[in-house]
Amino acid sequence: AGYTFLIEQYEPGDEIFVFGFSRGAFTARSLVGLIRASGLPRHTEAWKAPQALKRYRSSDPATKPSSEESHRFRLGYSPDVVTSQKEADWRRAQGHPVPPLLSITYLGIWDTVGALGIPGYYKWLAQVFNHSQGFHDTQLSSMVMAARHAVSIDERRKTFPPTLWGNLGELNRENPDRKRSYQQLWFAGDHGSVGG
């Protein structure tokens, strides 16, 4: 629903802010991953969204966001924006016009839980369902200009461990002018206290 809303409403130059708590934080991170992988088609082409989701779910290395195949896909699917400088350079080298860079202005999330609805105490069911949803790209992308993740330090339930970002140091080093734009901090309290 969030992706379709953006397709229908986004105009180049708009700022995009994405927020979520718990499983909603996982969904917010997945939405940003989908945007990074596919871009956004024109309003009149919202019917193309299933193509993007199918590619996003694929484990084929050719569908990774930075691959040349993905650049080709976005050229046809999302011609009015690029999702990275690498893609802009690729379009220029191929003789195509270079549209504006699509970015996420801010991603704010609280206590991301990666389990998509099946608690761990239903172990076999959780493994089947959660594995089938394992395509989600929840790593932080440099297309996000600033991001914060508040994580509860006192949560003791083993069924929903937090899903942490592992690449913040790298992103902060690559973007020193942004002054620690990417942060993941622990806060006192359990899951409901930090997010509620």
Describe each region flagged by the PLM.
Residues 1-196:
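Alpha-helical segment proximal to the catalytic Tyr-Lys
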